[in-house]
Structure formats: C-alpha cells, structure tokens
Amino acid sequence: MIVTTTPNIDGRKIQNYYGIVTGEAIMGANVVRDIFAGITDIIGGRSGAYEEKLQDARQIALKEMEQNAARMGANAVVGVDIDYEVVGQSGSMLMVSASGTAVTVV
C-alpha cells in the first residue's frame, strides 16, 4: 500500500477514487498525565517516552487507515494528513487521526 501526503504519485496514474479513509488511535489518561507531569525521561528538553508513544499512536492510526483503504479495494492513499488532538475530560486523552483519499494507482 502506497501512502503519501501528496495529492498524486509521480509516475503513477490514479485510476479510481474510493473516497476518504481514516484511522484513529487514542492514548489513555495515564499516559497523557504521566507525559505532561514530566514523569517521563526528559533528555535535552525532549521526552523520549512521549515521542515513542506518539510514534506508536501514529503507526496505529496509519495502519487502520491503510486497512480501511484496502477493504475498499484501493492500493494507495493520497493526500494523507495526520492530526493530534487532546480530548476527554480535562484533556485526559490524546487522539491521533490519519485521513486521506483511497485510490487505485496503475
């Protein structure tokens, strides 16, 4: 599955458009609370544990989006956008969402 932020793929022609596909991942209250409380390992102003959790959530969201595209018959997703949003009561959760357009390229 080809996944790209661009609206097209160089050297490939979009044959079919299937519509918008999405994927989401939500990090629970304990992870977000720990991250913002500074309990994680901060090295040089960056939190390695936080970055790892964000990477995990991003990969889950992208994988879910790809699976949804494959179910539609697509072999690529173009125009991908990844968003991060704090949700829940008092910002207790972090949601990572990925969205794009499912297409078939040849």
From Swiss-Prot:
It holds the Pfam family YbjQ_1. Belongs to the UPF0145 family. Transmembrane segments: none annotated. This is UPF0145 protein DSY2697. The lineage of its organism: Bacteria, Bacillati, Bacillota, Clostridia, Eubacteriales. InterPro entries: UPF0145_dom_sf, UPF0145_YbjQ-like.
